[in-house]
């Protein structure tokens, strides 16, 4: 942990009293979208029938991005969403998002040669160094912030990296 403290904590924010509500990806992400604990949102796994994108999909109109967009926010998502997103309907954009740059399965966990749904258009990124997934997400987020900065409209930007899931390159 010394490198983490030196490189991140000393230059940013630390959370000393935080916890994950569930030790799996989808059940841990669902509370952020729904505002509910696991026993209420019923997402208990990463794949059907207990979890994943299709399990949460029927509730998308009643999630944080939908609430914020209704309240006047410009809502943008960049990166990973939920396991299974994009497998059956790769150009679908969940309710509530004004802009969407979502990683689509089965390439979500690829750091190169992956595909994003960019506002309903599928874009494939290749193997060049400039296509490293974490860097692409970061550049998109910075560009979105810069583009939106002059606006008086509040911005909600969700940037969800894949690398922490698998200690990627």
What is each stretch, according to the model?
Residues 1-169:
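Formylglycine-dependent sulfatase
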């Amino acid at each position: 942990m010394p490198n983490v403290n030196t490189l991140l904590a000393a230059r940013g924010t630390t959370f000393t009293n935080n916890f994950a509500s569930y030790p799996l990806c989808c059940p841990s992400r669902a509370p952020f979208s729904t505002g509910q604990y696991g026993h209420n949102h019923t997402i208990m796994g990463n794949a059907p029938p207990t979890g994943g994108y299709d399990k949460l999909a029927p509730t998308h109109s009643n999630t944080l991005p939908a609430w914020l967009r209704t309240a006047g926010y410009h809502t943008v998502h960049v990166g990973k969403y939920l396991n299974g997103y994009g497998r059956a309907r790769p150009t679908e954009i969940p309710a509530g998002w004004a802009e969407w740059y979502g990683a689509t399965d089965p390439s979500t966990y690829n750091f190169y040669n992956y595909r994003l749904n960019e506002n309903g258009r599928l874009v494939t990124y290749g193997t060049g160094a400039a296509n490293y997934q974490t860097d692409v997400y970061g550049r998109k987020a910075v560009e979105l912030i810069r583009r939106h900065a002059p606006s008086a409209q509040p911005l909600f930007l969700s940037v969800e990296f894949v690398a922490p899931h698998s200690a990627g390159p």
